[in-house]
Amino acid sequence: MAKTNLSVDAADLTSRITRTPFPGSRKIYIEGSRPDIRVPFREVTLTDTLVAEGSETRREANPPLRLFDSSGVYTDPAASIDITRGLSPLRGAWINERQDTEALPGISSAYGRERLNDPALSALRMAHAPVPRRAKAGANVSQMHYARQGIITPEMEYIAIRENLVRAQLAERLATERVPKTGHSFGASIPKDITAEFVRDEVARGRAVIPNNINHPETEPMIIGRNFLIKVNANIGNSAVTSSIEEEVDKLAWSIRWGADTVMDLSTGENIHETREWILRNSPVPIGTVPIYQALEKVNGKAEDLTWEIFRDTLIEQAEQGVDYFTIHAGVRLAYVPLTANRLTGIVSRGGSIMAKWCLSHHKESFLYEHFEEICEIMKAYDVCFSLGDGLRPGSIADANDEAQFAELHTLGELTQIAWKHDVQVMIEGPGHVPLQLVKENVEKQLEACFEAPFYTLGPLITDISPGYDHISSAMGAANIGWYGTAMLCYVTPKEHLGLPNRDDVKQGLIAYKIAAHAGDLAKGYPGAQMWDNAVSKARFEFRWEDQFRLAIDPDTAMAYHDETLPKENAKVAHFCSMCGPKFCSMKISQEVREFARLNPSTTTLAKAPGVIPIQQVSSGFEEKAEEFRKGGNEIYS
């Protein structure tokens, strides 16, 4: 087992993190109703379109494109970042203004105090960890509670601005661009304009969640719900084999650079508590965990030795650090375990298998299920969101949509109602491995059983033959399930089922899933989603190569692939690429056809659409070619 050095190399950590903006992009901020609501976007600068008019060429300006940006200050060159101190508490003033929380005199968790008082760990700890806060006696500090009181919080206004994708930009572009394709939302209620009131209403109904622990004020508020943009989660975390705090913080920054909307810390190695603190203090996105993993470490990996008291202490420990959502497998009940006996791959969820083993060892109902109301009391005191785990999810397409999976799903619906009674936010985790023809049924059953609580799925993988390429097979399932109504997709990397992902694997998984999420947004008709596609297509047709690179979901790779065969700078203004060459480029030929039609007008056309070749011109062209053929001796091959 690899041992962690009992220190953190701050210089190494700072040097690891990629800070440069994307090519041709800059960070901009849109201000809300108050100066401290500053919503980030990535603005892509575009070059002019060159329009030939006879012997003259005029320029048409292309307005910049603004994109959703979850990368935080890490892509803002103007920001000052000190990893050892963490990010600025963006939401600190908002939390204090509500006057319903209080600073604690110390850490409540027994394990947290034990770690704090261990002098051997002093070099691992963050020197500037904040004092934890908790709801005042009798108070509920969840965003759902505020929403149900009719209160629009600054977080809700922030989210509305963010989700709107700068609608003014949409109106300007629609005046000059093609009308977006009509989507099919399968019953979702996506408005043309996202308002703060709409955000409040969706959270109050339980159809959306805002994961924002009061002890994680560094977060830039975001929302998860099927009436909003589809979000993507990335998993990071140490293991018994690798356990560097520096590596995990770097993976966090790397993940959000490539579009992770939330990050789960699934650490199972050493110094989980300290690793999580560094991640939280430097994360502008919500952080989720699976608390049972750390609880298991506290009993030396013996599931049968777990107790409610140990688990409860772990929840409080992590809530006071600032974890925004907990995956809790409370739906794995004793009676459901035998339902997995005839499965091809049994129980594949780590959390699910831990709880199944505990239930069988004691022949008792799960302590997570039995103590669920007490868990709700903890969650609402810190505003931690439930991510109710699918511990009985299928681990192969042979086991998809079986009795065990759906029995647990109905229990998750029951638990959702209990959580909502406490005004605690809930999302529901889903599979897994599901063949394409069964994907839609998963969403339909989840919406019904769990009362439209947001669905959060791992993939699903739609085939089991793709080790090494599971990010591709699962992204296919993810695009479909996102279209049908899933609110957040948990990424899969090329290393799924094979090993712990490295930095490049994280990027590959995120790119695949950001494409899947965007495809889902297009399919369900999310307003403004198609602007990005139109901008890429226009740049491609006009041979604005630099703009194509800038607008690509992965600019670095797009440019690198182009330059492999056409590396010279003049190739970036050429009207062809290496695929077809200069004589067979369809877009170049299409432009020539348009220009030919413009210079040879006729009153008789095949259609009235702009750019269609006049019919007389087509006929004369046919005659010319026929005459050439006759003069050539009527030979097909010469």
Swiss-Prot record:
Chain positions recorded as [4Fe-4S] cluster binding sites: C577, C580, C585
GO CC, alphabetical: cytosol
Recorded metabolic or biological pathway in which this protein acts: Cofactor biosynthesis; thiamine diphosphate biosynthesis
Catalysis performed (reactions): 5-amino-1-(5-phospho-beta-D-ribosyl)imidazole + S-adenosyl-L-methionine = 4-amino-2-methyl-5-(phosphooxymethyl)pyrimidine + CO + 5'-deoxyadenosine + formate + L-methionine + 3 H(+)
Keyword terms: 4Fe-4S, Iron, Iron-sulfur, Lyase, Metal-binding, S-adenosyl-L-methionine, Thiamine biosynthesis, Zinc
The keyword Zinc belongs to this UniProt entry's keyword annotation: yes
Required co-factors: [4Fe-4S] cluster
Binding-site residues, Zn(2+): H433, H497
EC number: 4.1.99.17
Source domain of life: Bacteria
HAMAP family per the UniProt record, alphabetical: ThiC
Function recorded in the entry: Catalyzes the synthesis of the hydroxymethylpyrimidine phosphate (HMP-P) moiety of thiamine from aminoimidazole ribotide (AIR) in a radical S-adenosyl-L-methionine (SAM)-dependent reaction.
Oligomer status and interactors: Homodimer.
Protein name: Phosphomethylpyrimidine synthase
Gene source species: Polaromonas naphthalenivorans (strain CJ2)
Phylogenetic lineage: Bacteria, Pseudomonadati, Pseudomonadota, Betaproteobacteria, Burkholderiales
